[in-house]
Design a protein with these regions (language model features):
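Extracellular/surface-exposed low-complexity repeats and stalk/linker segments enriched in Gly/Pro
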Residues: 1-27, 45-54
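Surface-exposed ligand/attachment interfaces on beta-rich extracellular proteins
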Residues: 11-22, 71, 100-104, 131-132
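Right-handed parallel beta-helix/beta-solenoid
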Residues: 13, 54-85, 102, 120-123
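Short hydrophobic/aromatic-rich beta-strand motifs
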Residues: 21-38, 61-64, 96-98
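Solenoid scaffold repeats with emphasis on beta-solenoid/beta-helix
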Residues: 61, 96, 103, 109, ...
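Extracellular beta-strand-rich solenoid/capping regions of secreted or surface-exposed proteins
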Residues: 91, 104-118, 126-172
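Short glycine/acidic-rich loop motifs that flank beta-strands on beta-rich extracellular proteins
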Residues: 94, 106-108, 122, 126-134, ...
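Right-handed parallel beta-helix
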Residues: 144-226
Length: 272
């Protein structure tokens, strides 16, 4: 006979059941924390108490392939389906956690100030653009994008990551791109246009950014913008790193394989 369906309750903050408190098929509800528990039994592994869903954590949003953009995004069980929907409700200080899967996004995605977008793993989280004639991400000061693979094809000169040309902001903390892979053909992996930002540096920072964007550009720095580049690895690009009109960059521990040009510089800025 099946175990009856039961719910045990506690109103003590932070209290959860132990294995001995539950039978298989029983649920335990903490009414203070709004958290639900049950038993999981796996042959050869054992029996343990697991939390179902989980309570919302302030300033953390979730995206997964089972989500819905009508959801709140505040828990994995109530996740958004797209990065754009999560970014659309993010505020300063928000972290967006993206689960494994392929996400086709209505770009550009305009990321507010001081927001982090972090994937489960760059090998398992892929983001592709719907619109070949639009940049993928427009970033703001203090943003971080990490553990994502960008894939697809865009028009020549379109950027994966760039400053927002529609909202020029003072850069007091550089956007940071780390542990990402760019496979978007023809794209500019990182576009630092100093005309689209204000401040003493007008800068972006990147670490461990691998680029296989055939016929594209790895990092473009122009109009007295600045980039700090660490561990940039490019393959089959037209130009790995290009500085124009007074753009400057520091490049450390990086490599350009195949392609046409490793380093390109032309033009001068207004400042000497």
């Amino acid at each position: 006979m099946a175990t009856p369906f039961r719910i045990k309750r506690s109103a003590v903050p932070g209290k959860g059941p132990s294995v001995s408190d539950l039978q298989l098929g029983e649920l335990a509800l903490n009414t203070y924390d709004a958290e639900l528990y049950t038993l999981r039994s796996r042959p050869g592994i054992g029996t343990e108490v697991v939390k179902i869903g989980g309570a919302a954590i302030e300033n953390v949003l979730y995206v997964n392939k089972d989500g819905n953009d009508g959801n709140s995004g505040s828990t994995p069980a109530d996740a958004k389906a797209t990065l754009k929907a999560a970014v659309g409700i993010a505020s300063e200080g928000t972290a967006i956690k993206v689960a494994a899967g392929t996400y086709i996004e209505n770009n550009p995605i305009k990321v507010p100030k001081q927001v982090s977008i972090v994937g489960d793993s760059l090998r398992e989280v892929t983001v592709s653009p719907q619109n070949a004639d639009e940049d993928m991400f427009h970033v703001s000061p203090g943003d971080m994008i990490s553990e994502l693979t960008f894939s697809g094809t865009v028009d020549k000169g379109i950027a994966v990551i760039a400053f927002d040309p529609d909202k020029i902001q003072y850069v007091n903390q550089s956007p940071y791109i780390r542990f990402c892979t760019n496979r978007v053909a023809n794209s500019i992996g990182l576009k630092v246009d100093g005309n689209k930002a204000v401040g003493p540096f007008k800068s972006m920072v990147t670490d461990s950014y691998t680029q296989y964007n055939v016929s594209g550009i790895g990092v473009s720095v122009s109009n007295e913008g600045y980039a700090q580049i660490v561990s940039l690895f490019t393959m089959n690009l037209d130009e790995a790193v290009a500085c124009h009109s007074g753009g400057q960059c520091d490049v450390t521990n990086s490599n350009s394989s195949f392609g046409n040009y490793g380093l390109v510089a032309d033009g001068v800025g207004a400042l000497q």
